[in-house]
């Protein structure tokens, strides 16, 4: 009985250790230029910026949303968690917007590093990147429900 108890306890400890070292889901954040007057925005206002329904920030600066390539983990997170849709639906939206309104999608850059550099250089820029990539050159924008 003691041996069976010890074996069961050892199995639980190994299972707990295995889960502790397992892969963690990467975290992503929205970033803006350090001069941006907002510390947070709600999802609908962020959506208006990225879907080009609003072209300027309230203080007058041109809004410059920046996208990462299709199927990037950060873009998948942004589409699902912030816009509450899929990447494919966003692409369909832009096909329709180009055809009906002549509106182009956000600038697409090849990497999170490029997005961060662009946000740091442009007062009206907004992008999403892995949280681990944030440094003092940009400001994290909190997403309100």
What is the predicted function of each stretch?
Residues 1-8:
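Bacterial N-terminal signal peptides that target proteins for export
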Residues 21-145:
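Exported/periplasmic ABC-transporter solute-binding proteins
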């Amino acid at each position: 009985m003691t041996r069976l108890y010890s074996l069961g306890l050892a199995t639980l400890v190994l299972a707990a250790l295995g889960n502790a070292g397992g892969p963690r889901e990467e975290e992503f954040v929205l970033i803006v230029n350090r001069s941006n007057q907002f510390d947070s925005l709600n999802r609908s206002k962020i959506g208006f910026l990225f879907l080009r329904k609003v072209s300027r920030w309230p203080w007058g600066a041109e809004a410059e949303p920046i996208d990462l390539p299709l199927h990037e983990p950060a873009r998948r997170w942004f589409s699902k968690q912030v816009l509450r849709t899929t990447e494919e639906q966003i692409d369909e939206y832009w096909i329709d917007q180009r055809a009906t309104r002549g509106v182009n999608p956000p600038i697409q850059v090849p990497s999170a590093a490029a997005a961060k550099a662009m946000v740091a250089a442009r007062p009206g820029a907004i992008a999403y990147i892995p949280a681990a990539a944030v440094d003092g050159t940009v400001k994290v924008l909190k997403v309100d429900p």
